[in-house]
């Protein structure tokens, strides 16, 4: 049973694109539109990913930022995350207007993170590639990878854990440490088929 209807997913992707285009072109942050479905005012975690079109998945990323926790209404969080992904991802220069027609927008709506309990060595058995995203926290460090990432890279569960440690700026085997917290979550993912094209729900497997 999906939490997010297909038409809501399309609404969010279109909203993310409009937010990016308006900010990149005019420096203006849009407001949630009138007629926003009331369900999208519920607080949920969300990430917006920008991918370059017609580029292999491992090389396509152009920006990805979001909110792991449900701290903002989903419609507002989508606008914020879209703009941040376009201009504030520290891995990339800000998106230029000339790039807007070559970028595919993807919106991932997250479930609240769930702490994985039990001995650290059992963690790989308690996650599933193709279903779960991961958050790893240790001290001041934290890192998140969305559920679609291990699919795109062909990782198994242990490699997924190691790469999330790496994303957090930690050694790749830190998931074996007792004081490392590992959280899992799921996501409903919607993406444009091509820039400004039809929006579809993205299956993971």
UniProtKB/Swiss-Prot annotation:
Name of the protein: Protein TON_1965
Taxonomic placement: Archaea, Methanobacteriati, Methanobacteriota, Thermococci, Thermococcales
Coiled coil: none
Domain AMMECR1 per the UniProt entry, residue ranges: 7-201
InterPro entries: AMMECR1, AMMECR1_dom_sf, AMMECR1_domain, AMMECR1_N, AmmeMemoSam_A, Uncharacterised_MJ0810
